[in-house]
Amino acid sequence: MHAYRSHTCAELNAGHVGQEVRLSGWVHRVRDHGGVLFIDLRDHYGITQVIADADSPAFAELETVRAEWVIRIEGRVKGRDAALVNPKLATGEIEVYATGLTVLGAADELPMPVFGEVDYPEETRLTYRFLDLRREKLHANMMLRSNVVRSLRNRMWDAGFNEFQTPIITASSPEGARDFLVPSRLHPGKFYALPQAPQQFKQLIMVAGFDRYFQIAPCFRDEDPRADRSPTDFYQLDVEMSFVEQEDVFRAVQPVIRGIFEEFGGGRRVDADWPRIAYRDAMLWYGSDKPDLRNPIKMQVVSEHFRGSGFAIFAKLLENEGTEIRAIPAPTGGSRKFCDRMNAFAQSQGLPGMGYIFWRKGDDGAMEAAGPLAKNIGPERTEAIRQQLGLGEGDAAFFLGGKPETFEAVAGRARNEIGRELGLTEENCFRFAWIVDFPMYEKDDEGKVDFSHNPFSMPQGGMAALEGDPLKVLAYQYDLACNGYELISGGIRNHKPEIMFKAFELAGYPASEVEKRFGGMVKAFRYGAPPHGGCAAGIDRIVMLLADEANIREVIMFPMNQRAEDLLMGAPSEPTNEQLRELRLRVVPKD
């Protein structure tokens, strides 16, 4: 018999009755029923009930054990009476009568219990993450993650992709976030960077003649934390392909992602048809470039109904160039109480409020419009709005106006809130969409032209497109959205040096800077680069959706907290003076 166990704690059943066995695991729970001890013994695989009475040689020692002690049990398998069978346990037909006990590891008093799923403060959970991970839900999340990664690998291999590893220590490059810098001991004053993504390396793999690449890649970005984003590092399914156009990438990747959600989605519906939605349409209809399509609400432009109307705020607003009025339909939302609640929501998001109209049957049985806007614009305009939006009795619509970039994001959040409040957002399904035709450039906070997405993407129209207004240039860039989250981002790459130099020039990077920052890739492109493209899928977010978790930390083994601190390992930490001397660094105190 093995030194520690003959079976796991999920393995024994009625077929083992009468056998002598050895089990090892953690004491999950102890119950004393008047001279009979019941111990739930837990390991990675499951739970087995162990019993001992006063006649058992192990009884006295078993009375001393406490929760989360690690013990080894010798005993005999007994069948449970029919009335005592526990159908919730794989081992619920049997129990093990203990004849021997060895304590393998005692446990101090627990700062948080493992038994049960009681919520504890995040600080406690992350400080004692090894205990937190013993809890059933979190343990299941980590196993889900492991199985998802295994399935991703298998599916990529089956699709003809090859897995290659790229460097973890590399040069800094501008890819949309702050780098984590690593000082060089051998080259004082110089720094490496942890890669924000394997972007340049995977493109170089294509230039080197390998056709289909993938990697489960760690990525490092010094970012502000969000519920769906780690502040320091994350893992992605990194993909690149040679001799492809945009649709080729979609055809290769879509079956992999759909298969993962079908395999691990717990029966939730996965639509086979994934629409392509242009970025501008996504912002117009949904107020987001990662729309939640479970919500059927689609916003519309209704400017003409307010131009020259009696509602002076909107009418005057529309006199300014680049402004418009948008409506958010709210089917079944036609009550003043609901409209006031949504107006308060808009105010909580930083807006003065939202105008609204709701429709009801009047005393004469005819349809009538109510609400502040209805009184100002009159029945003809309100009826035209109702017909355009396809609304009827008991429905409402909310209105926002201005330059779209000033209110689109809030409109999108209001759309989501309305869908949730009215029960319109579909449950138990995954709704995907490819968002395409992203703008190549945007203006930053200082009004300067900068890349809006990935700087390595090919502009639609090539060099000719870059000769005009940069803010009108579209790129071969795309995202995959699912249920309001961005799961994939990618693009067809700019593999022509002359177009790359021009693209960077428009964003304020002279050729010398491009050569300095991306010299390796530019050099490679001068020796015959194939057209290529790819994408990266966020593994953490995929698992978060599959596990139905609201916070990404629930699917990461050892996550940082909101302040980018590892409370268990004490990171970040202060270096020793010796370490600083070796690196020829000194710490400059804050002002």
Swiss-Prot record:
Recorded catalytic activity of this chain's protein: tRNA(Asx) + L-aspartate + ATP = L-aspartyl-tRNA(Asx) + AMP + diphosphate
Residues binding L-aspartate: 175, 221, 453, 493
Subcellular location: Cytoplasm
Enzyme class of the recorded protein, top EC level: ligase
Binding-site positions, ATP: 221-223, 486, 538-541
Taxonomic superkingdom: Bacteria
Keyword Cytoplasm: yes
Biological process terms in GO annotation: aspartyl-tRNA aminoacylation
Presence of keyword Cell membrane: no
Region entry Aspartate, spans: 199-202
Entry EC no(s): 6.1.1.23
Site (Important for tRNA non-discrimination) location in chain: 33
UniProt entry keywords in alphabetical sequence: Aminoacyl-tRNA synthetase, ATP-binding, Cytoplasm, Ligase, Nucleotide-binding, Protein biosynthesis
MF-aspect GO terms: aspartate-tRNA ligase activity; aspartate-tRNA(Asn) ligase activity; ATP binding; nucleic acid binding
Cellular component terms per the entry's GO annotation: cytoplasm
Pfam families: GAD, tRNA-synt_2, tRNA_anti-codon
SS bonds (residue pairs): none
Role noted for this protein: Aspartyl-tRNA synthetase with relaxed tRNA specificity since it is able to aspartylate not only its cognate tRNA(Asp) but also tRNA(Asn). Reaction proceeds in two steps: L-aspartate is first activated by ATP to form Asp-AMP and then transferred to the acceptor end of tRNA(Asp/Asn).
HAMAP family, per the entry: Asp_tRNA_synth_type1 (MF_00044)
Subunit structure: Homodimer.
Family the entry assigns: Belongs to the class-II aminoacyl-tRNA synthetase family. Type 1 subfamily.
Protein name (Swiss-Prot/TrEMBL): Aspartate--tRNA(Asp/Asn) ligase
Taxonomic source organism: Cereibacter sphaeroides (strain ATCC 17025 / ATH 2.4.3) (Rhodobacter sphaeroides)
